[in-house]
Amino acid sequence: MWTGGRRPGRLRRAASAADMEKLSALQEQKGELRKRLSYTTHKLEKLETEFDSTRHYLEIELRRAQEELDKVTEKLRRIQSNYMALQRINQELEDKLYRMGQHYEEEKRAMSHEIVALNSHLLEAKVTIDKLSEDNELYRKDCNLAAQLLQCSQTYGRVHKVSELPSDFQQRVSLHMEKHGCSLPSPLCHPSYADSVPTCVIAKVLEKPDPGSLSSRMSDASARDLAYRDGVENPGPRPPYKGDIYCSDTALYCPDERDHDRRPSVDTPVTDVGFLRAQNSTDSLAEEEEAEAAAFPEAYRREAFQGYAASLPTSSSYSSFSATSEEKEHAQASTLTASQQAIYLNSREELFSRKPPSATYGSSPRYAKAAATLGSPLEAQVAPGFARTVSPYPAEPYRYPASQQALMPPNLWSLRAKPSGNRLAAREDIRGQWRPLSVEDVGAYSYQAGAAGRAASPCNFSERFYGGGGGGGSPGKNAEGRASPLYASYKADSFSEGDDLSQGHLAEPCFLRAGGDLSLSPSRSADPLPGYATSDGDGDRLGVQLCGPGSSPEPEHGSRDSLEPSSMEASPEMHPPTRLSPQQAFPRTGGSGLSRKDSLTKAQLYGTLLN
């Protein structure tokens, strides 16, 4: 037991030293661990600070991005709303355009149908117009042919009465005569001539002008132009003034109206004697020219239209039968062709070369210079167309060939008391011998005067013819004049038709200028032109006397069957006869058919008035 006591001590000392070493080692580990913990804590704190700063930055960036996103989102929303609005507008416009397109398509189809229908109607109308134009042209030609046949018919003595005409045609005739300044015959004068209408007036009413021709519209103005030009440049004949004659054709058989519209007396003062130069012929007397110049108004005796460029008139009588254009017509009427001038000059030479019969002109001092003999009738029948011309010598008379009977209007002798067979034969004979003859030929014939110093009025003839004779003076002792009833009735009819010598009456103005040196006397029964015979049928004939006033003795006739219209006495001491140039004597061209038509018209009128 003692031995055991020492051992626990030593064991206790050994255990405490080992524990001391273990405690120091643990103390060291504990300090090292504490260092590591502080380092880690410090590091963690740094990391936490960095994390906080980073999170703060990210939060700021996030807010900024959020704001930008919001802005972009708003923009997109506005853009989307605008787009939707535009889509709606576009849809509406598209719908509207579609509807308009549909409407226009329908209208286009409807208008296409209408165009097709209108084209068909236009084609039908064109065909109808063409047919109507052809029918109208045929009707116009037929009407003009009827009017021409009416003027050229053989019934020259036919008197048309207003009461026998249709009612509508009566109105047309009345309007035509009122328009052109004439009137129907008065039943108070002579009942046999009352209610009668001249054939030429009926023909004028029936005739239809060509719508494509301007000649009917321009003929009046061109005729007036020619009249003024002839009165100004060539102081000679002129168209008559309306106051010179009666207002209608009734002057020839209405002696009761002789005091109305009478021409002025010979005693009227004359202010311009030389205006009417060579009215009757180159042998006409000065006093006669003075008296005729006094019968016209002052306006016609003055050169009122100096330098007025006038054109030759174009006849409207054949306007509806004209197949040429207006340019060709005016070109033909502007000047004489070479062939016509040659024919005219040849005619003058042949006519002037003929000799008058010595028995007829032997006692006339005015024809002392003329030759001795006249050609045979066969030679006279070969006379060219233009028989009457102006003598180039003052003392030489007109030559009038024997063929002039065939050249005068047929009605002048168709009313004579002879068998109808002879009249028909004469008509057939003259139809083949017509020449360019105007009514101025008839109007140019002068009659022996029955009373000296009286005005040249157409009523002077009617006073004798219907009133029981005139003066008892010898026709061979009275001066010639232009008081022929043919001349007066022609001038009156020219105004009654209202054309002022424009429709073919100026086809031969040389006969107006030449005047009427050809007197009608009963002594020349064998002369070319048979005269008028009254209803008594005594057989007296009024031949063509180829001498001037007082040139040859003639038998006296006091009965009212002798035609003795008064004229104006004149003396050859005033001024010498004038000489006309060929241009004055033949200023008109291309009038063969026109002159014939006008001559037939006037001849029918004379037959109606003097029947």
Swiss-Prot record:
Q: Give all Phosphothreonine modified positions.
A: 268
Locations listed in the record: Cytoplasm; Membrane
Please give the chief subcellular localization of this protein: cytoplasm
Extent of Basic and acidic residues compositional bias: 554-563
- Residues recorded with modification Phosphoserine: 219, 248, 265, 284, 364, 391, 474, 484, 494, 496, 519, 521, 525, 571, 581
Q: Which UniProt keywords apply?
A: Cytoplasm, Membrane, Methylation, Phosphoprotein
Q: Where is the signal peptide?
A: none
Asked if the Swiss-Prot or TrEMBL record annotates the protein with the keyword Transcription regulation, the reply is no
Residues that the record marks as modified (Phosphotyrosine) are 156
Chain positions covered by the region annotation Disordered? 520-611
Q: Which domain of life is it from?
A: Eukaryota
Q: Per the UniProt entry, what are the Gene Ontology biological process annotations, in alphabetical order?
A: evoked excitatory postsynaptic potential
User: In its keyword annotation, does this UniProt entry include Cytoplasm?
Assistant: yes
> What does the record list as coiled-coil region(s)?
none
**One annotated Gene Ontology cellular component of this protein:** dendrite
Q: Which residues are modified to Asymmetric dimethylarginine?
A: 399
Membrane topology note: Peripheral membrane protein
Expressed in which tissues: Brain-specific. Expressed in neurons and rather enriched at synaptic junctions.
Q: What does the subunit comment say? A: Interacts with DLG4 and DLGAP1 and forms a ternary complex.
Per its database record, what is this protein's job? May sustain the structure of the postsynaptic density (PSD).
Protein name, per record? Brain-enriched guanylate kinase-associated protein
Q: What is the species listed in this Swiss-Prot or TrEMBL entry?
A: Rattus norvegicus
